[in-house]
Amino acid sequence: MASFVTEVLAHSGRLEKEDLGARISRLTRRVEEIKGEVCNMISKKYSEFLPSMQSAQGLITQVDKLSEDIDLLKSRIESEVRRDLHVSTGEFTDLKQQLERDSIVLSLLKQLQEFSTAIEEYNCALTEKKYVTGAQRLEEAQKCLKLLKSRKCFDLKILKFLSMELTIQKQNILYHLGEEWQKLIVWKFSPSKDTSSLESYLQTELHLYTEQSHKEEKTPMPPISSVLLAFSVLGELHSKLKSFGQMLLKYILRPLASCPSLHAVIESQPNIVIIRFESIMTNLEYPSPSEVFTKIRLVLEVLQKQLLDLPLDTDLENEKTSTVPLAEMLGDMIWEDLSEYLIKNCLVYSIPTNSSKLQQYEEIIQSTEEFENALKEMRFLKGDTTDLLKYARNINSHFANKKCQDVIVAARNLMTSEIHNTVKIIPDSKINVPELPTPDEDNKLEVQKVSNTQYNEVMNLEPENTLDQHSFSLPTCRISESVKKLMELAYQTLLEATTSSDQCAVQLFYSVRNIFHLFHDVVPTYHKENLQKLPQLAAIHHNNCMYIAHHLLTLGHQFRLRLAPILCDGTATFVDLVPGFRRLGTECFLAQMRAQKGELLERLSSARNFSNMDDEENYSAASKAVRQVLHQLKRLGIVWQDVLPVNIYCKAMGTLLNTAISEVIGKITALEDISTEDGDRLYSLCKTVMDEGPQVFAPLSEESKNKKYQEEVPVYVPKWMPFKELMMMLQASLQEIGDRWADGKGPLAAAFSSSEVKALIRALFQNTERRAAALAKIK
């Protein structure tokens, strides 16, 4: 092979292009022969797995020698071409291009040689457990294969064999690295399937082995460092750390953040550090943020020292050592989940429920800052402020949100509690809240301007006739205990707003308004069935609404000078809600009244129109209907007794009794024929109503106090006097009827129209001259 170059160099003077072409052709054929032999060797080695080490070494020697010859020949050709450009430049250029193609083929053969060498060195390193060296050799082989694939000069089948071999060896080293990782990082768990119990936590352990391994190349490394760097070289470090981080979160950090009694214990033994748990009794329902930060910081400090602060040599050949920020890498993977968990399971429970405790929260903010600074020093966190600290610093907003949420939840619980548990309200009743604070100094002048007027001389402005002190008080009645507590909650919340920041005060104020909006929507829906069926609950609900409306009239006025300035311009009012509550209570009670009226009329419909009372069956039916009506009214009188205010009670009972009496009057006046016996029996039925009707007016539990209202029945029952006149007519003579008519000026004329009186006379008396004369007087 050397003779080729010798002959070329021996020529002096002008190089014959024909002779040069012949020599290049012979050189090209030789390159193709070597290429075939190399490909055959590669195929046998990686496809047929035949031992061919000696043959490969011989081929390598031949390739190197041939490469030197080509370089010398190419240099000589270039000098000849430059010297003899006037002689067939194109032909020499073609020869040069052919020679360059041969050079490319030889360079690819060198890449094959380097690939084979890298695989051999990798196998040796893997046998000696030099994982970093092995990983680096695999990466070198990967680069060689990538270069080979970029050129289209080789058989694709051979490249496929090489790719398969590289994949197998990479999976092989990853398997060995995984086994080493499991030996160095050991998790121990409870055999129980319930991994969230305290007993399960106490059996969880993390073992970190720190034993020194033998030297890898020049620099001694701990096994963990060697394994981590090998993972890094292979591009698998991120996934391995992510898996470790998720387990760290699940089995160590989250339990420490959620369980107040759980504490981390660090045990240092020769070549091993153990992280486990112990339980310390505590009365805390939720963990203190400061304690949680301390416990988590302890665990992360151990991990930083034993695992994440190891020197990882990324360039062993040049002896340049740079520390890979493993702590920062792990922090990026777990911090978002960890901080969110700390907020939801720790910080959120530390938010004060009272504005007076907001100053104490500064300690938690400070401990949060110290916790984050410690993590930044350990490189778990970067320099920016995280969501955890932002959450802690935004305490005013969180306090307001939590307070508003607690208020709404408490209010809804009161609204969905039983209505029938009542308390008695009297005009002197007051809401049980602390005394309101005096207005701020800035507002005192305003108060004086509003309430005090300076006069040059003393004047007596007191009116001669004063109102009763209870003129604007709510009348005595019974309301639901839950509604009384609801109003106390509203007052307490507004009182809290007077000592809170402006933002918080506004939120609390509108939370109180939301309470009443919620009442308007929830109570009629939640208690709908009971309000329709039970008259007592309808009356209580009516009182509840009137009680709330009564307080809403002055609620905003009481606090208007003590709330935030933004609320003191007239927006701090609840008066706009008053009509809605009055309408809500009135509609519910009127619906119950309509239902009771319907029942009364239904019972009276079974009286067979009060006709033919001489028939025993008809009389019995009419008597039963009257008794049922009176019984219903008495029952209502009892269930509404001491519940409704006296005036509402009397109006309601008067309306219902008036409905029954009106129906009876209408039925009797519609009769066309009333015999003497019929008249007597009708009178008897009416006498029963007249005697027992007043007894339904019993608004008070003390019977002696009800006599006054029973004597005032005509005031509440418009048809009471016409009913008495009807009874008189059933027993009176024509003369007595005429006297009570008194030419349209008597009591009978006030109760009935002339046509109604004439109809009754025709029904009661036979057609005689006396009846005709009496009818003639009724005009």
UniProtKB/Swiss-Prot annotation:
It is a peripheral membrane protein. Signal peptide: none annotated. Residues 2-317 are annotated as: Interaction with RINT1. It holds the Pfam family ZW10_C2. It is found in: Cytoplasm; Endoplasmic reticulum membrane; Chromosome, Centromere, Kinetochore; Cytoplasm, Cytoskeleton, Spindle. GO terms for cellular component: endoplasmic reticulum membrane; lipid droplet; nucleus; RZZ complex; spindle. InterPro entries: Zw10/DSL1_C_sf, ZW10_C, ZW10_C_2, Zw10_middle, Zw10_N. The modification Phosphoserine is found at residues 3, 12. Transmembrane segments: none annotated. Residues 2-81 are annotated as: Interaction with ZWINT. Its main location: cytoplasm. GO terms for biological process: cell division; endoplasmic reticulum to Golgi vesicle-mediated transport; mitotic spindle assembly checkpoint signaling; protein transport. Residues 14-130 form a coiled coil. Disulfide bonds: none annotated. The modification N-acetylalanine is found at residue 2. The keyword Transmembrane does not apply. PANTHER family: CENTROMERE/KINETOCHORE PROTEIN ZW10, CENTROMERE_KINETOCHORE PROTEIN ZW10 HOMOLOG. Essential component of the mitotic checkpoint, which prevents cells from prematurely exiting mitosis. Required for the assembly of the dynein-dynactin and MAD1-MAD2 complexes onto kinetochores. Involved in regulation of membrane traffic between the Golgi and the endoplasmic reticulum. Belongs to the ZW10 family. Interacts with NBAS and KNTC1/ROD; the interactions are mutually exclusive and indicative for its association in two different vesicle tethering complexes. Component of the RZZ complex composed of KNTC1/ROD, ZW10 and ZWILCH. Component of the NRZ complex composed of NBAS, ZW10 and RINT1/TIP20L; NRZ associates with SNAREs STX18, USE1L, BNIP1/SEC20L and SEC22B (the assembly has been described as syntaxin 18 complex). Interacts directly with RINT1/TIP20L bound to BNIP1/SEC20L. Interacts with C19orf25 and ZWINT. Interacts with ZFYVE1. This is Centromere/kinetochore protein zw10 homolog. It comes from Pongo abelii (Sumatran orangutan). The gene is ZW10.
